[in-house]
Regions:
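Secretory targeting and sorting signals
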Residues: 1-35
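Extracellular/luminal low-complexity Ser/Thr/Pro-rich, glycosylation-prone repeat/linker regions
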Residues: 34-39, 136-163, 264-326, 443-470
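Short beta-strand elements of extracellular/lumenal beta-sandwich folds
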Residues: 42-69, 168-194, 331-365
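Hydrophobic beta-strand positions in extracellular immunoglobulin-like domains
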Residues: 61-65, 122-124, 140, 184-187, ...
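Low-complexity, intrinsically disordered segments enriched in Ser/Thr together with acidic residues
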Residues: 105-130, 231-274, 409-439
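Acidic, serine/threonine- and glycine-rich low-complexity intrinsically disordered segments
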Residues: 229-361, 366
Length: 470
């Protein structure tokens, strides 16, 4: 067996590193190892395998080491007797019911924090039936570290168990390009799946092709859902695919990274489509059809990175779509008499060709903008999606949507700010004096350094002027 890696790399690896870092904090990893001491831990999640006759499932045994001398994982398989067997890579040593594995050979020996995984293939024994369970004990030990001891449960289920093998990525694509995401799956359960339902979710910049056995519906954030029902049997151990995959086009509003997610499940027993989403068939198109894969099911099992229900998911990434991005700050004059109440209208418009979502904005919110209130103007009411900003010795921080502040932060109330869209808010204000400094609406937060970049910096800030009426 060889260790498996997810098909997505850049963004996927970043997410994995973040997740692992969070796990290490939960496990109690030291921020910095003490001189002369090491740290070594392992993690094997619980696994569900099919009953007797199922081909088995691969599960990663994760290892985390820091300054560890001679780190190794010792796995005790005694608790599996009568229920399941476990197969380890050739670089592990087996003695009776005990298996000892060093760090995986692909782990960088010079890394300050070493992270890797040991693939373990669990197979049901003859006579294993739904409801059976067993326990695997393991110890992470090193010559200069305290041992870490844990267990994992191996449960036996009775049914089909589809694993999605359809992930992938391309580095770059242009608007108008036609691409396809692979559709490939295997059944690691002990019963045949009679038909398969695949649910696709496309990001805002992707347009799906038309298929006669699929239903289409719009989702929030300008995304698209496509549900396809495919006939055909997927027997235990079989790997199936769709020739040509799932086609889609890079739309005119695509920008930076785009993605297509897919979820597979047995067609028998799949829930009815939610009526509130308004799924509809499209006219024309051909049918998506399953066929046996040219890759053997055994290899597919080894390459499966996870084998819990989460393995029904796969993602296809387009890392970069060159397109224009240009947000423009908007402001209208504050008009009224001294002592009178009026409004301060501020906002932002997407005048570029590409859609912007909350991930690609880099701010956790889509299209945040900042309002500096003109001198001689007092805010009396604050619109939704806006909060006051205050300056301290450590910088600026946001507070509640309180009146009376001199700075406010606002954001578009959506996960996607599409090309051509405009969002504006109205502050209730009172003009208290004349002749003060103008305010501003800016895409950059207060401070000496810019926080926003797009294709045209000249329209990222606009003045808020006060016009006095007699």
């Amino acid at each position: 067996m060889r260790s498996a890696r997810r098909p997505h790399a850049r963004a996927g690896r970043a997410a994995v590193v973040l997740a692992v870092t969070a796990s290490l904090v939960a496990l109690g990893a030291p921020a910095q190892a003490e001189t002369g001491s090491g740290w070594f831990q392992a993690q094997l999640d619980d696994v569900v395998i099919g009953a007797a006759g199922a081909p088995g499932k691969a599960k990663p045994l994760y290892v985390y080491a820091q300054d560890a001398v001679n780190p190794r994982v010792v796995v005790d398989l005694t608790g599996l007797l009568g229920v399941a067997s476990a197969e380890f890579p050739a670089w592990c040593a087996t003695s009776g019911t005990q298996v000892t594995c060093p760090l995986p050979p692909d782990v960088d020996p010079d890394s300050s924090l070493q992270i890797g995984s040991i693939p373990v293939l669990f197979r049901p024994l003859a006579g294993a039936s739904g409801g059976d369970s067993a326990t695997v004990s393991y110890r992470a030990v090193a010559d200069n570290a305290d041992p870490f001891v844990a267990t994992a449960t191996v449960s036996v289920g009775d049914g089909a168990d589809l694993v999605n093998l359809g992930g992938g990525r391309v580095d770059t694509a242009a608007v108008g390009d036609l691409l396809s995401a692979p559709i490939r799956l295997t059944n690691v359960g002990n019963r045949t799946s009679r038909g398969v339902r695949i649910t696709f979710t496309l990001s805002s910049g992707l347009t799906p092709s038309t298929w006669s056995n699929c239903w289409y519906a719009p989702l929030t954030g300008h995304r698209t859902s496509v549900v396809c029902d495919l006939n055909g049997r997927v027997r235990p151990g079989a790997t199936m695919e769709v020739s040509g995959g799932f086609g889609f086009e890079i739309g005119g509003s695509a920008y930076a990274g785009e993605s297509l997610d897919q979820f597979v499940e047995p067609l028998t027993g799949a829930a009815a489509l939610p009526t509130q989403l308004g799924y509809q068939r499209r006219e024309g198109g051909t049918k998506l059809r399953l066929r046996p894969s040219r890759t053997t099911s055994a290899a597919a099992r080894v390459l499966t990175p996870e084998i819990d229900p989460g393995d029904n998911w796969a993602s296809f990434y387009v890392d970069n779509v060159p397109n224009s991005l240009d947000l423009a700050a908007l402001a209208e004059p504050v008009v009224g008499p001294v002592g009178g109440s009026t409004i301060l209208r501020a906002g932002v418009r997407n005048i570029g060709a590409g859609d912007l979502d909350d991930f690609r904005s880099g701010a956790g919110e889509v299209a945040p903008f900042y309002v500096r209130v003109p001198s001689g103007v007092t805010v009396e009411s604050v619109p939704d999606r806006c909060v006051a900003l205050y300056e301290s010795e450590d910088g600026w921080y946001s507070g509640e949507p309180q009146p009376g502040a001199s700075w406010y932060r606002c954001a578009v109330p959506s996960s996607v700010f599409a090309a051509g869209e405009t969002y504006q808010v109205d502050f209730g204000v009172r003009i208290t004096s004349v002749g003060g400094a103008a305010g501003a609406v800016s895409l950059n937060m207060p401070g000496p350094y810019p926080s926003w970049w797009d294709d045209d910096r000249d329209n990222d800030e606009v003045a808020v002027v006060v016009q006095i009426q007699s």
